[in-house]
Amino acid sequence: MNILIIFTSYLLGSLPTGFLIGKYLKNIDLRTIGSGSTGATNVLRNVGKWPALFVFIIDVGKGLIAVKIAQYYTDQGLIEVIAGISAISGHIWPIWLRGKGGKAVATGLGMFLALSWKVGLASLGIFLIVLTKTKFVSLSSISAAILLPIFMFFYLGKFIHSYFFISLIVALLVIWKHRTNIKRLIKGEESKINQNQ
């Protein structure tokens, strides 16, 4: 059962929401334009606001549902964590798109909303605050990722816990996926939310 949960979580994460929306609404391949990501931000820049919101909600749902399925069928915290990271892996490296997907932010949010809604909402709050102040989605995502393990530590009250370790892994993964954005931020070349790439 555990293997089935993990495999299903990966397939759920692999659902190429942004790619399908881009193809259906504008006949474009998001992997070849803008940032090359199939996530909500690239959808926003190249397809539109409402399609981007739809993609964001679905991508959050992928992480949340994967963990909730694991919680329903098992009481093992480790399986919940693996299910969540499997959904994130599917989102980043979707089998249907030859491994070229999103940057794990929305699906990661969904995962942590399921594991600890307080930590998930705190991270979302940081994202929104930084976005409001700077208009940089990438900086907002990176800021939320950096603070995620800190929020998880305060929630748990200890370091030695699978939730803390996975929050650290996801944070590092999100930062790594934004490495080109970090270079552009340093050079002053990163696009703001109201700018085209």
UniProtKB/Swiss-Prot annotation:
Record keywords, A-Z: Cell inner membrane, Cell membrane, Lipid biosynthesis, Lipid metabolism, Membrane, Phospholipid biosynthesis, Phospholipid metabolism, Transferase, Transmembrane, Transmembrane helix
Transmembrane region(s): 1-21, 50-70, 77-97, 111-131, 136-156, 157-177
Alphabetized GO MF terms: acyl-phosphate glycerol-3-phosphate acyltransferase activity
Functional pathway: Lipid metabolism; phospholipid metabolism
Main EC class the enzyme belongs to: transferase
A GO BP entry: phospholipid biosynthetic process
Subcellular location(s) of the protein: Cell inner membrane
EC number: 2.3.1.275
Main location class: membrane
Any one GO CC term of the record: plasma membrane
Membrane topology: Multi-pass membrane protein
Domain of life, source organism: Bacteria
Residues in coiled coil: none
Catalysis performed (reactions): an acyl phosphate + sn-glycerol 3-phosphate = a 1-acyl-sn-glycero-3-phosphate + phosphate
Pfam families tied to this protein: G3P_acyltransf
Listed InterPro entries: G3P_acylTferase_PlsY (IPR003811)
Assembly notes: Probably interacts with PlsX.
Family listed: Belongs to the PlsY family.
Described function: Catalyzes the transfer of an acyl group from acyl-phosphate (acyl-PO(4)) to glycerol-3-phosphate (G3P) to form lysophosphatidic acid (LPA). This enzyme utilizes acyl-phosphate as fatty acyl donor, but not acyl-CoA or acyl-ACP.
HAMAP family: PlsY
Protein name in the entry: Glycerol-3-phosphate acyltransferase
Species assigned in the record: Prochlorococcus marinus (strain AS9601)
Gene that encodes it: plsY
